[in-house]
Amino acid sequence: MDTFSTKSLALQAQKKLLSKMASKAVVAVLVDDTSSEVLDELYRATREFTRSRKEAQKMLKNLVKVALKLGLLLRGDQLGGEELALLRRFRHRARCLAMTAVSFHQVDFTFDRRVLAAGLLECRDLLHQAVGPHLTAKSHGRINHVFGHLADCDFLAALYGPAEPYRSHLRRICEGLGRMLDEGSL
C-alpha cells in the first residue's frame, strides 16, 4: 500500500523552506512589531549573558523555526484533538508565565527564578507532547535548546538582577509582554 500524500509532501517542503529562511528579515514580515521588539530584547539579553553573538543568534533562530513550524502544523490541520488540547494548555501556561514574569519585574523582591524556570520547563514538555510525532528529532532539539536557555536559573538571575544592561532589557521585554497580554496576542 502506497502512503504517498501530496498534502504531507507540501507540508514537509514548507517546513524545510521555513527552516532555511528563519532570519531577521523573515521574522519582520511574519511577526508583529511588539513581538519583534520582545524578540530583539531577548536576543540582546542572551548575547550579553552568553557573550556570544553566534549563540544568541542560534537560540533566536531556533525559537523562530519552532514557532513557524508550529504555525504550519496548525494551518495545515495536522494536529488532532488531544494535541490541540495540549497546545491550548501550553498557550494558557505561557500566558500565565508571561503575567508572572511581568509581575516579578513590577513588584520588587518577588522574583523567584525557580518559579519561572519550572513554568518554562512545563511549557517545553507540553509543547513536546503536542507536536510529538509531527516534528523531527532536530526540531525537538531546538525546543530543548530554546527552553533550556530561557529556564537557565543563572540567565534568569542575571536578567532580573539590578545590573545594567540586563535591567533595561528586562524592562523592554516586560513592556512588550504587557502589550501582548493586553492585545491578546500571547
Curated annotation (Swiss-Prot):
Pfam families: DUF758
Lineage: Eukaryota, Metazoa, Chordata, Craniata, Vertebrata
Quaternary context: Interacts with FBXW5; TNFAIP8L1 competes with TSC2 to bind FBXW5 increasing TSC2 stability by preventing its ubiquitination.
The protein, known as: Tumor necrosis factor alpha-induced protein 8-like protein 1
InterPro entries: TNFAIP8-like, TNFAIP8_sf
Induction context: Up-regulated by oxidative stress (OS) at both transcriptional and translational levels.
Molecular function in Gene Ontology: identical protein binding
Tissue: High expression detected in most carcinoma cell lines, especially in cells transformed with virus genomes.
Keywords linked to the UniProt accession: Cytoplasm
Primary location: cytoplasm
Species whose genome carries this gene: Homo sapiens
Cellular component aspect of the GO annotation: cytoplasm
SS bond list: none
Compartment list: Cytoplasm
Function: Acts as a negative regulator of mTOR activity.
